[in-house]
Amino acid sequence: MAVTTRTVSEICAAAKRAAWELAAAPTEVKDAALEATARLLGERSAEILEANAADLADERAAGLTSALRDRLTLSEARIDAMAEGVRTVAALEDPIGEELERKALASGLGLRKVRVPLGVVAVVYEARPNVTIDCAALTIKSGNAIVLRGSSYAERSNGALAAIVREALAEAGLPEDAALLVAGGGRAELAELATQEGTVDLLIPRGGEGLKKSLQDVATVPVIYAAAGNCHVYVHADADLEMARRIAYNAKVQRPGVCNAAETLLVHSDVASEFLPGALADLHSAGVELVGDERARELAGAVEVGVATAEDWGTEYLDLKMVVGVVGSLEEAVDHVNSHGTSHSEAIVTSSEAAADRFTTGVDAAVVYTNASTRFTDGFEFGMGAEIGNSTQKLHARGPIGLRELTTYKYVVRGDGQVRE
């Protein structure tokens, strides 16, 4: 089984031993493990769905919002998508061993800088079982072992998926302990995982501000926060308004419970009276609850728009709710995004290259779009096959965390007897 009775410390130590072996594995062996994972996902789909149904029926899931239940829910289509994502990762170029630099030193030594795995990557995530497979695929391909700590809501689903990964590793001749799942979803296990210096090389928590804050005070291992996404769509004065309506609708409605969904719509005052009635009617018809500033409410037409509070502008709803504001200039839009955003994904709709350039250089975010939905911030969409999360930090990775973001480098030096004088 993927879930063991070992302590967190024992799990991380076992993963470290597995990581040493996996780091030296040839590309074809790692790819064989991934192909086996994809195949087993199809063969075991009934078992996976049974485990997922039990999670959804559990009383612990009864109070989940519709968005969180959507995150927790698996289907044949989502399992097929997971398998396809694994195959895509298998087909990607292996980053391990890539030569980043080569030079001859004055001492006569030959120096090479080569890409190597991080070692053990621990991932903490909430109610999205597909993360189990996405993360495992990326870590296997990049030569890392993984320790997974999922939500208690998805305990059965995660267990079924992690067991498949372990079986696939063994089938390929790799150590099963390269993929381990920590049982229990309590704070004690989380705090212990965050303090495994010497065995955990990187911790990636995927979740909201509550998870981030719970780790900031205790973590002693390196952490990359795949944190909240309070994303904005800004409609500039010269925007194609039909395009802007499609983008705003897609960014909010297509899948509201994910971190790259838009939470705020900003509109330039020059086009607000023309744009807002239709755009807000679109959103309202999709069940989006709308709140806004005074100007947006005045221009909403027949659509009911509530009063936005100060907290609304900084909230990641992860649901069918959106805050709407009218701004007087591009500079005001940039200032608003930088003041209230989470450095995740931001979008401008404009026909002006100058406006696009000002927005993309002025906004402090991992991903900035011109004339496109924020929903594209995703490892699969970016050609990475999958992602472990989206980093809103600037060190060690920013944006989707794919294969190369799960590596570091070492210097390999070759001599013929040199000693330093």
What are the residue ranges of the model-derived segments?
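ALDH superfamily catalytic-core signature
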Residues: 2, 6, 126-128, 134-145, ...
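Solvent-exposed alpha-helices and their adjacent loops that cap or buttress functional pockets
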Residues: 102-103, 111-117, 139-140, 171-175, ...
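Conserved C-terminal structural/oligomerization subdomain of aldehyde/semialdehyde dehydrogenase
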Residues: 118, 309-421
